[in-house]
Regions:
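Eukaryote-biased, non-catalytic alpha-solenoid scaffold regions
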Residues: 1-318
């Protein structure tokens, strides 16, 4: 039998509402985080609108902070942001998914300022943001937002993803965007790919590092980042649309001899019922594969492709 001094729900209930209220007031006088949590609970009694107001104010306050967060304050900050996430999902989302979606998006966007002024090497804050991101797609579907607005928001967030807070966003938004939205998003990134990155005059170029190949210039690194961003976005959109040829188009010809790239292409061709083309894609990388190395996906996809063509007896050949 548990002691009457054990901290559990049954024992606390024996104190009565008045005494518990007094104790909580004493606690919140010295604990700001507990105070904010109680404010959220009180706001929830008046409906999701009051909770939304409290959450919005807290997110704005966190976003405005500029002081560096010491390592011992990272966990409390993570708990604070997690409390806002839970309030959004538990008190707002069930009755007002559109408002919940807006607030959750703002919460995830906090990653940019927050991770800029703290050391999250243990991933404490990153886990909170990733948890919020994981339900964003379902919340967007429930909110039934206009497709054009959602396209613009996804585009802007993918482009402003310095800390990886929106990693995998296109995939998560596949359902709420729909085919039309995905194609509209693709057009935006295709237009971005056509943008010419202007190189500043040599005397104005900023050196950011040195390597065996020479000097690293800021504009060159930015151009490469731009190219990677666009290519990855178009790859994600191609996969979301099930457009194998669009995926292949994003794989440079000189990289298709890499067994890992060849396997990625072949796997998609196989899923599209194009087993013969999958074998051809794998064959293009066989020379490098035979030189050694560990290429489990190449082997796995080749076996599956041969089996699909009715050549299971050849699956282990070569």
């Amino acid at each position: 039998m548990a002691s009457s001094k054990t901290l559990n729900q049954a024992n606390l209930e024996t104190l009565g509402a008045n005494r518990l209220a007094q104790l909580l007031l004493e606690l919140v006088a010295v604990d700001a985080q507990t105070k904010r949590r109680l404010r959220l609970e009180l706001a929830s009694a008046n409906g999701s609108g009051d909770v939304a107001g409290e959450v919005a104010k807290r997110l704005a306050t966190i976003a405005k902070a500029e002081a560096f967060v010491d390592w011992n304050k990272v966990k409390p900050l993570a708990r604070d942001i997690e409390a806002q996430r839970r309030a959004i999902m538990e008190h707002i989302a069930p009755t007002d998914p559109a408002t919940a979606f807006e607030l959750l998006w703002k919460l995830i966007a906090l990653a940019r300022p927050v991770l800029s002024w703290c050391d999250d090497s243990h991933g404490t804050l990153g886990t909170v943001f990733a948890t919020a991101l994981s339900v964003l797609g379902a919340l967007a579907a429930a909110a039934r937002l206009p497709t054009d607005q959602l396209v613009d928001r996804v585009f802007d967030s993918v482009c402003d993803n310095d800390h990886g807070q929106f990693h995998g966003l296109v995939t998560l938004m596949t359902e709420p965007l729909g085919e039309a939205g995905l194609k509209s998003l693709r057009r935006k990134f295709e237009a971005m790919a056509r943008e010419v990155q202007q190189r500043p005059p040599q005397g104005e170029r900023r050196v950011i590092g040195f390597g065996s190949g020479g000097v690293f210039y800021e504009d060159e690194m930015e151009a490469r980042r731009h190219e990677r961003l666009v290519r990855q976005a178009l790859v994600d959109i191609a996969d979301a649309l099930g457009d194998v040829d669009a995926f292949i188009a994003q794989c440079p010809a000189d990289q298709r001899h890499n067994p890992a790239i060849a396997a990625a292409i072949a796997e998609r061709l196989l899923a599209a019922g194009r087993a013969a083309e999958a074998i051809a894609a794998l064959d293009a990388a066989e020379a490098i594969r035979r030189k050694g190395g560990h290429w489990p996906n190449w082997d796995r996809v080749r076996i599956a492709a041969l089996d699909a063509l009715g050549h299971a007896e050849c699956a282990q050949c070569g």
